[in-house]
């Protein structure tokens, strides 16, 4: 299983400015994270579309429109990945999932609202454990996502 140290090593290898922030209380939901930091929270949610994983990256306060995802990726069935699937596919637990540094390449969809945030704006996202968040500039995160080799769909409004 992967954790905050694996995420930290992944980012250090890419020579990126970031911080893995540790909390006393868990930050497993975007609401619990928002209660502990000032700033923009994004979340990474793994879906299964016709048995293939799709990672959706969106603002913490927003919800996924499953029908939009289904149409975008041209599949019949879309569902949330089960906890076991999240761990098997990404290497991380639900509630700790970062948008990067996964066990395998995962097709990704980014919320269009995320692309509208200033490049140097600080965002917080899953930090690899239930007690850590990744603090990073939005532009740096999107650059890493672009270099990941993951298939990406155009940004959509969730």
State the predicted function of each range.
Residues 1-158:
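Extended, low-hydrophobicity, polar/charged segments
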């Amino acid at each position: 299983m992967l954790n905050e140290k694996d995420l930290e090593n992944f980012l250090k290898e890419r020579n990126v400015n970031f911080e893995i922030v540790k909390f006393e209380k868990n930050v497993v939901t975007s609401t619990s994270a928002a209660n502990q930091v000032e700033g923009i929270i994004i979340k990474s949610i793994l879906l299964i579309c016709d048995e293939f994983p799709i990672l959706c990256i969106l603002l913490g306060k927003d919800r996924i429109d499953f029908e939009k995802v289904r149409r975008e990726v041209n599949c019949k069935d879309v569902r949330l990945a089960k906890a076991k699937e999240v761990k098997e596919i990404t290497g991380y637990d639900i509630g700790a999932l970062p948008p990067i540094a996964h066990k395998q390449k995962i097709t990704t969809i980014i919320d269009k609202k995320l692309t509208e945030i200033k490049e140097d704006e600080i965002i917080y996202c899953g930090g690899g454990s239930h007690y850590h968040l990744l603090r990073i500039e939005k532009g740096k995160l999107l650059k890493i996502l672009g270099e990941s080799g993951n298939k990406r769909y155009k940004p959509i409004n969730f």
